[in-house]
Structures are given as C-alpha cells and as structure tokens.
C-alpha cells in the first residue's frame, strides 16, 4: 500500500488555485509551431544552413487550422519536379487517423511509385473523424495534386487534437498559396519544419550529403524534418517525419530500407509511453542526382541503408531532446543479452518507467528503480503461462551511470551486489544534460539502445492544458 507524508497530504488538500500558483513559474508551451521564443538551450539544434536534395521544393504557410493561430505556419507542402519512389512506416495504433488510412492505401495502389509530394497540416489530427475525415484527407491530396497537374500523387499527414474535423475549406483554399510559396532554400525548408510542429519548442531539420560505392564521384543529398514532443513511443508515436533524397533508390528497395532505419531510430525512442493515432515517416527518392539505380542485395543498398539509419537516428534524437518537460537526454543501453528482442524490451521498459524518469529529473541516483524496471520487463501477463525469464539472471546483472564527458562509469550494481555509491559523483553525472544508463545482463552477446528523457512538472502542465 502506498503511503503519503503529511506534507504530501497537505499539498493534495490545497485548493486548485493554490496548486496552479505553485506551478506558475513553469514556462508553458504554445500548442502550435515554435515562435521566436525558442529556448536558448535548444537553439544549438537548429541549423543555420543546409544542403538540400535536387528537384525538391517545400513551403510552410499560415492557414489558422486552430482559430487561435494567426501568426505561425501550420500547412506544409513538399513537392518533387519528377515522380518519386516512396515508402512510409505508419502507426500500429488501431484507431488510425484518416490521413494514415488514406496514405497507406495510396502507396499500396501506386506500388510505391509515382508519388510527387506530401501535404501536412498541424493543429488538428483528423483522427477518429469517420467517413468525413477520410473525405477531408482526400480533399487535401486532391488540392495539392491540382496544383501539380497530377492525380493520386500526394501523401497526406496531420497532427494535433484527436476527434475534431479539419477546417477543410480553409485548408484547401490555402493549398494554392502553399504551392506558390514553394522554394528550395534553407529558409524554405526551415519554414516547412516549423509548419508541422505542435508542442515542439524548436523545428527539427537535418540535411546531409553522401556517396554510394557504384558512383563515388556523385554527391547525393538527403534532408528531413520531423515533429514530436509528447505521445512518443513505438510503434511509432505522435511523430511525423518526411525524408527526401535525390539518390536513385528503387521502389522495391525503399520499403525495406526505411523499415530497417525506423526500427533502429524512431522506434527506439520514448517520451511518455503513449503511441499516437497519426504517426507516419515517409521517404521519397526522386533520383535526380543520377547514378545507378539502387536495388536490394547490392553494396549500394547496404551503404544507403547505413546512411538512412544514421540520418534517422539523428532526427529521432532531436525529438527526445524536445520531449515535453524534458531537462535530460538519456541513452538506455542494454548489453550482454541472450537476445536482441529481450534487450530491446528491457531498454524500452526502463526508458518509459515514470519512477526512473522522475528520479532522473530529481537528480536522484536511485538505481533500484532501474533494476526494478529491468526485473519486470519480461515477466508474463497474469493470464499467460509463467515465464522464468532466463534472459535475466540477478547475480549476473550490472548497472552503471556512464558520463558523456568521457570520465569513468559509476558502477551502481556489480554482479547483483550493490556498490557503495559515491553520491557526490552521482550528483555530478546527473547534473549533466546528457547521460547514459548501462545495464549488463551477462547472459549473451546481444544489445539494444533506446533514447528517452526525464519527467518534470512541465510535462503535466503541458498535457493538462493541451486542448486550451
């Protein structure tokens, strides 16, 4: 049974107004694209320049999807001069939003070919909106298609509040405006990144160059933007991502290479353990940089898969760094496991444990919470046969904090026995913005990594006020 201290009970008895006042010092996040008031600590993650793929143009336009928004872009458009090979990974939530249903069907119909753009609105998820919601998603695509002189060539994404219909007339009337604003500059890409944001405090945009073994003299480009700060947990979370490349990736190779990358990036992060209705990560390749077409089973395929996985990991980590109420970026690494599946499940369980996350926020070296999460991560559900969890052997288990400044790890548990923890050293490590929790299972040679953040008072404030 959980007990409460007298202090805690007195706080629970406080009038609502007093409780609100006690958190009044916490800066609130506006539910819309980030403004000029980007936190100083986050500005370092916003690029000041970039190198963008040939043939793609983008824009961000103010529509006012939420009536309260009159100043920030909330409609994003990406187009390609030529048809693209395309693939997407979608949420596994059973209540899939209308744009997810629409876009999945489109890619199946087109065989991952002939896609020429993506249209995205923020401010309304168009989720759990019935037949009318599907019609609205189709209207968004048709409006963009009309601007391009195409048909069935546009992927649709939406993000925002669930259960509300889109102001569809307002959106489709502004799609031509979004089309006329298209451009390929860094500022255009950054504006698009801002347009897909909701509770994000900064736009998330990355661009890189790379080469492939068969065309060492050709410089390829890849660029992508993503959004997400809450309701983040595989598979996937309120997370939208658009990645574009001018490399010639075949339509048959694109789905597998994207799934491989997403499993090791966007599906390896968690903010709060909630999986959204709208998650979509789409990859478009128009081949305009030239070179040999990339197909499965070739050195080019392996090389591009590595490039995309690293690129996707960088994008996914930006989401964690902008987690709602987050003050820390935490890497959870589980090694020496009997299986990769077990390592992933353990890392995921630790990463989403509220007790672990609040201890990290409080700078409390409470390794018992880490061990507790490890211990229950693989146990059977009550209705299932008992699993003795051979992947976890208590006397083989080790837990450490690993500083990111290159200094020695702080051992907390060694072979199932607690260490005499240097609390002063632990406090120094927990004071850092970045830290790693390392769990060695001692039962094999497999491993997995997750990225998460802490929980602060601000997380409650943001989500308590989400619809207001």
From Swiss-Prot:
GO terms assigned for molecular function: glutamate N-acetyltransferase activity; L-glutamate N-acetyltransferase activity
Transit peptide residues according to the UniProt entry: 1-23
Record EC number: 2.3.1.35, 2.3.1.1
GO BP term, example: ornithine biosynthetic process
Keyword Hydrolase: no
Classification via InterPro entries: Arg_biosynth_ArgJ, ArgJ-like_dom_sf, ArgJ_beta_C
SUPFAM superfamilies attached to this UniProt entry: DmpA/ArgJ-like
Enzyme class, first EC level, given as a word: transferase
Keyword Protein transport: no
Function: Catalyzes two activities which are involved in the cyclic version of arginine biosynthesis: the synthesis of acetylglutamate from glutamate and acetyl-CoA, and of ornithine by transacetylation between acetylornithine and glutamate.
Family, per entry: Belongs to the ArgJ family.
Subunit-structure text: Heterodimer of an alpha and a beta chain.
The name this protein goes by in its record: Arginine biosynthesis bifunctional protein ArgJ, mitochondrial
Origin species: Podospora anserina (strain S / ATCC MYA-4624 / DSM 980 / FGSC 10383)
């Amino acid at each position: 049974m959980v007990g409460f201290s007298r202090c805690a009970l007195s706080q629970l008895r406080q009038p609502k107004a007093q409780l609100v006042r006690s958190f009044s010092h916490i800066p609130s996040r506006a539910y819309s694209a980030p403004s000029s008031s980007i936190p100083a600590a986050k500005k370092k993650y916003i690029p000041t320049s970039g190198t963008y793929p040939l043939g793609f143009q983008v824009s961000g336009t103010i529509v006012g999807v939420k009536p309260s928004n009159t100043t920030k872009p909330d409609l994003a458009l990406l187009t390609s001069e030529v048809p693209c090979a395309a693939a997407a990974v979608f949420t596994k939530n059973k209540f899939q939003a209308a744009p997810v249903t629409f876009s999945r069907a489109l890619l199946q119909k087109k065989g991952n070919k002939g896609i020429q753009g993506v249209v995205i609105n923020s401010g309304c998820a168009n989720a759990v909106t019935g037949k009318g919601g599907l019609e609205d998603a189709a209207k968004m695509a048709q409006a963009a298609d009309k601007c391009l002189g195409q048909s069935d060539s546009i992927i649709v994404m939406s993000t925002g509040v669930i259960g509300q219909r889109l102001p569809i007339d307002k959106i489709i009337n502004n799609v031509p405006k979004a089309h006329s604003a298209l451009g390929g500059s860094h500022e255009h890409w950054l504006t698009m990144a801002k347009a897909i944001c909701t509770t994000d405090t900064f736009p998330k945009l990355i661009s890189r160059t790379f080469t492939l073994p068969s065309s060492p003299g050709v410089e390829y480009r890849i660029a992508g933007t993503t959004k997400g700060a809450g309701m983040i947990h595989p598979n996937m979370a309120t997370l939208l991502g658009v990645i574009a490349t001018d490399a010639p990736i075949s339509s048959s190779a694109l789905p597998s290479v994207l799934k491989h990358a997403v499993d090791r990036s966007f599906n390896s992060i968690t903010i709060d353990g909630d999986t959204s209705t709208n998650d979509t990560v789409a990859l478009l390749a128009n081949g305009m940089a030239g070179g040999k077409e990339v197909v499965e089973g070739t050195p080019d395929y392996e090389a591009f898969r590595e490039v995309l996985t690293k690129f996707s990991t960088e994008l996914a980590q930006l989401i964690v760094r902008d987690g709602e109420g987050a003050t820390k970026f935490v890497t959870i690494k589980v090694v020496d496991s009997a299986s990769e599946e077990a390592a992933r499940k353990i890392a995921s369980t630790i990463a989403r444990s509220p007790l672990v996350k609040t201890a990290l926020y409080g700078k409390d070296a409470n390794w018992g919470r880490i061990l507790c999460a490890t211990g229950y991560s693989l146990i059977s559900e009550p209705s299932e046969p008992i699993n003795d969890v051979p992947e976890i052997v208590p006397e083989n288990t080790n837990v450490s904090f690993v500083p990111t400044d290159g200094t020695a790890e702080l051992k907390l548990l060694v072979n199932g026995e607690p260490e005499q923890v240097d609390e002063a050293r632990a406090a120094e490590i927990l004071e850092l913005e970045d830290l790693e929790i390392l769990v060695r299972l001692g039962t094999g040679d497999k491993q997995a990594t997750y990225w998460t953040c802490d929980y602060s008072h601000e997380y409650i404030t943001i989500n308590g006020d989400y619809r207001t």
